[in-house]
From Swiss-Prot:
It comes from Histophilus somni (strain 2336) (Haemophilus somnus). GO terms for molecular function: RNA binding; tRNA pseudouridine(55) synthase activity. HAMAP family: TruB_bact (MF_01080). The active site is at residue 48. Keywords: Isomerase, tRNA processing. InterPro entries: PsdUridine_synth_cat_dom_sf (IPR020103), PsdUridine_synth_N (IPR002501), PUA-like_sf (IPR015947), PUA_sf (IPR036974), tRNA_psdUridine_synth_TruB (IPR014780), tRNA_sdUridine_synth_fam1_C (IPR015240), TruB_C (IPR032819). The keyword tRNA processing applies. This is tRNA pseudouridine synthase B. Disulfide bonds: none annotated.
Length: 308
């Protein structure tokens, strides 16, 4: 007879993981979930096994707001090796082409101009994007190439950091859906020498502070103290995922109504429309709602806090 499954905790919050190289985002998310003994967890946009850096892990009710972090802009530091193109556009792939690197800094700075602002990008075959229910990387590993349409992305900032032939270091601030490997591969083709990613580190997601990140090893050390309250101190509030939305402060009666999923009308003197954070009279985060043109508040994603 199998043992009954151990019930997880109803813990809510966001853990800023500093992902190490080599692990998949899903594997490391499951480890974080177990260390917190959480009943539910989800990450907010996978990092390649080769990549390191910021990976927000949503626990409990915070998973309802993970999409906002998936959609958030992100910042990366990347080291590209010029002169070699690989099938995956990173160092985990096979080299498919080698070319001489005879590129000066002036040519690099000129080439970077083409990739700033609103641009179109064709997603890499080695991605988790789905085609007929299967991830593109599954087709790629089988030697099958699927036609992909170019998609609009935004490169808010593309900063030159360093160039020591053949290694080029850049910092990229970009919109959701941007593939840094593809950006580097495309840059290599513009330069005429080819390029691939050798190191990639995500240094920011939305407005989360870099210094709040913690590695899995550090989290394990706290876990070994068997003090869950101490562990929970390293969680950020789930409201932080939607902090860019305007806040709407409710009365006690309004808060009770939206808690039951009811729509409410309010005196909208500021003419607010669209998504808002709902705040209780006790200054507690209740969830996210949409205000329509008639100043009707429609609850969208509400927090459910179970009594202890």
């Amino acid at each position: 007879m199998s043992k009954p499954r151990k019930k997880g905790r109803d813990i809510n919050g966001i853990f800023l993981l500093d992902k190490s190289q080599g692990m998949s985002s899903n594997d490391i998310m499951q480890k974080v979930k177990r260390l917190f003994q959480a009943n539910k967890a989800g990450h907010t946009g996978a990092l390649d096994p080769l990549a390191t850096g910021m990976l927000p892990i949503c626990l409990g009710e915070a998973t309802k707001f993970s999409q906002y972090l998936l959609d958030a802009d992100k910042r990366y530091q990347v080291i590209a090796k010029l002169g070699e193109r690989t099938d995956t556009s990173d160092a985990d792939g096979q080299v498919v082409q080698k070319r001489e690197v005879n590129i000066d800094l002036a040519k690099i700075l000129t080439a970077l101009e083409q990739f700033r602002g609103e641009i179109m990008q064709v997603p890499t075959m080695f991605s988790a994007l789905k085609y007929q229910g299967k991830a593109l990387y599954e087709y790629a590993r089988a030697g099958i190439t699927i036609e992909r349409e170019a998609r609009p992305i935004s490169i808010f900032e593309l900063k030159f950091i360093d160039y020591q032939i053949p290694y080029l270091t850049l910092e990229v601030h970009c919109s959701k859906g941007t593939y840094i490997r593809t950006l580097v591969d495309d840059l290599g083709e513009v330069l005429g020498c080819g390029a691939h990613v050798t190191r990639l580190r995500r240094i920011a997601v939305a407005d989360y502070p870099y210094n709040k990140m913690m590695t899995l090893e550090q989290l394990q050390q706290f876990s070994e103290q068997e003090d869950l309250d101490l562990l929970d101190q390293h969680l950020l509030p789930m409201e932080s995922a939607v902090i860019r939305l305007p806040g709407l402060h409710l009365t006690k009666e309004q808060a009770r109504a939206v808690g039951f999923g009811q729509r409410i009308k309010f005196l909208n003197e500021q003419g607010i429309q669209g998504q808002v954070r709902l705040i209780s009279p006790e200054n507690l985060f209740l969830g996210v709602a949409v205000i329509d043109e008639n100043s009707i508040v429609h609850p969208q994603r509400m927090v459910v806090i179970k009594p202890e």
